[in-house]
From Swiss-Prot:
This is Riboflavin kinase. It catalyses: riboflavin + CTP = CDP + FMN + H(+). CDP binds at residues 13-18, 111-114. Pathway: Cofactor biosynthesis; FMN biosynthesis; FMN from riboflavin (CTP route): step 1/1. Binds 1 Mg(2+) ion per subunit. Belongs to the archaeal riboflavin kinase family. Keywords: Flavoprotein, FMN, Kinase, Magnesium, Metal-binding, Nucleotide-binding, Transferase. It comes from Aeropyrum pernix (strain ATCC 700893 / DSM 11879 / JCM 9820 / NBRC 100138 / K1). The keyword Kinase applies. One of its GO terms (biological process) is FMN biosynthetic process.
Amino acid sequence: MDCGVFEGTVFSGLGHGSFYVSIYARNLRRALGYTPYPGTLNLRVGDAAERLAGCIERARGVRIEPPPIPGERLASVLAFPVEIEGGVRGHIVRPEITVYKGDVVEIVADVYLRDVLKISDGDKVRFRLLDP
């Protein structure tokens, strides 16, 4: 599957990514083969959201089940392999429950992507989906 390259604008999220990545860390490690940095890189893809959604629908994602935490309402997460500019690999994560609209992409990796890519809010980042 080759959907081409997408571009998104970096933005600071609500700060929930680090919390949830930490909670799901063991299951993410088991499913993805690495321990993700505790946080997500948030990108707004704007007009490309519909094309990206179509590509994600056709992609084979990995379902990551939530850990059992009494009293918490957690949902599954779908993860899709991605290559970010500069050859850095990670996964787009799509939680079944989210506060974000369809134009937002959250990416996890085993490194702190903002440092590795030397990016900050407002910068553009290019990425592409990979076959698993």
